[in-house]
Amino acid sequence: MQKAFENKASNGGETILVVDDEKMILEVTKELLKSLGYQVYIAQNGKEAIDVFMEKQSQINLVILDMVLPGMSGSKIFDSLREINPDVRVLLASGYSINGEAEQILARGCNGFLPKPFRLRELAQKVREVLN
């Protein structure tokens, strides 16, 4: 049943940049997305995320962005990505509630919110929803 859902939920093929400072979350999210058929780039901080996005933006269909990162906040990274490409699709991921800063980022045009921790089904549904 889970396999049927995965195939139905994801057409795969798109490329996603995952930005998170926790190595375990990066690796697990990368593997989950790859199992759904996506190509995945990863970045552990804001500078790395912006560098990867600038280099690969023509290939990147979606950015999954952690809201709380050391050095550069998710909000600042979101704004920087939008300066590079105003049409970039961004899915905000956070262990914090949608209230406060996340709500402000969504109001500025972020494409969705994914509460952490998330399951494969939730990830697949939310990614597909934003990509469609």
Question: Whereabouts are the PLM-identified features?
Answer:
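Acidic, metal-coordinating helix/loop segments flanking the phosphotransfer/catalytic sites
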Residues: 30, 42-62
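Active-site residues of response regulator receiver
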Residues: 66
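Charged docking surfaces used in two-component/phosphorelay signaling
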Residues: 27-35
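Acidic catalytic/metal-coordinating carboxylates
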Residues: 45-48, 73-77
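Alpha4 helix (beta4-alpha4-beta5 surface) of REC/receiver domains from two-component response regulators
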Residues: 2, 75-76, 83, 87, ...
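Residue-level signal for the "D+5" position in two-component response regulator receiver
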Residues: 42, 69-72, 83
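The feature encodes the CheY-like receiver
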Residues: 26, 70, 98
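Disordered, acidic interdomain junction associated with two-component signaling
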Residues: 1-17, 54, 104
